[in-house]
Amino acid sequence: MKHLKKSSLLAFLMILAMFFAVSCDVAQEEDVTDTENEPSVFIDVPDNLIGTWEFNGQWTESYTITKDSFTNGYYTGNNAKVYKTDEKSGYIYIQYTKAMNADYSYSETAPDVGKWYAVHYKDLTDSTLKLSAAYKADGKSATATIEEAKAEFTVDNGYFGIYSELEKK
């Protein structure tokens, strides 16, 4: 009987030791995975960006932003996603459905249709914002993926220099 108790105790301790060893290995793997492939955080268009935004000066600019799309009367995109840089600024990414042709006209068959583009906004309030479309001499006009657009179309890369000051209508 004594031998059976010792064997049972020894078996229990071995199982317990294996449990702790396996548990430690799993925790280490999860920690490494969490820090290695940190995903970009794209969100749906927030409610305070949705609406029609206008500038009325020498010319009228109008931008319409919905949960899924962005248009300025010339180019249009859907699958809209936002990457916030803070509470008042960020980037709106769209997949072109209407883009510029080589002759500066806009159409649904332009080469960039289906590709990704970005617009930067800053100083967002409930009724105003500053908006700039991505442009850089000798820069890209669109990218194949949203991740490429996020890496390419940035303030630091020189794509956003002129901002329109807009009011919500």
Short names for language-model regions:
Residues 149-159:
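Short, exposed beta-strand-loop hairpins at the edges of beta-sheets
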Residues 45-61:
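Tryptophan-anchored aromatic micro-motifs
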Residues 10-20:
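Sec-dependent N-terminal signal peptides
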Residues 56-62, 75-150:
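Contiguous, well-ordered beta-strand patches that form the walls/edges
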Residues 160-169:
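Short, low-complexity, Pro/Ser/Thr/Gly-rich segments in the mature regions of secreted, periplasmic
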Residues 62-68:
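Intrinsic low-complexity, repeat-rich intrinsically disordered segments enriched
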Residues 3, 18-48, 169:
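Bacterial Sec-dependent N-terminal signal peptides
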